[in-house]
Amino acid sequence: ANALLGGTDAVLIFDESGFAKKGEASAGVARQWNGRLGKVDNCQVGVFATLCRGDMATLIDARLYLPEDWCNDDERCKKAAIPEDKRLFQSKTQLALAMLKIARQRGIQFGYVGIDGGYGKEPAVLRGGDKQGYRFVADVHCDQTIYLQDPEPLVPEWSGRGRQPSHRKPQSAPQRVDQWA
């Protein structure tokens, strides 16, 4: 894949897909959002990494999303033949970040990462990728709020009344994407 599609003009795209299911025995099946159907339904969800350049693309990694209820049910996991080391809950964004790290370790070359609004709304994805030195093209929801500069969250000074503050708060106000753009 890297020899044919890798390079600084390539993009590594992350997305998920739902697979409708009737029963409850398939690994990871649950009532959850199925983007292919456009509704919450009984399904499995996979997170996929695709390397693209021009009009060519290939799948380079895929992970089954295992809902937290599944991870906490050893008997159900055994029946579905899920190995013990795979029963640790990871959000879809955590799966995508893990695949991003593995792609780089494998030497996959790409100029930037593309993600849809489901991942673009997650600060952990953008921060995690930014810390690793990646450039992103991220779809975001129009009502998502953003900071144009680091909000420098701090614990506010105690006013002398009520409980003493313990949670950090941003020092600047966020803006909605549709009002900024």
Residues covered by each model-derived region:
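Active-site-proximal, Lys/Arg-enriched surface segment
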Residues: 1-68, 78-79
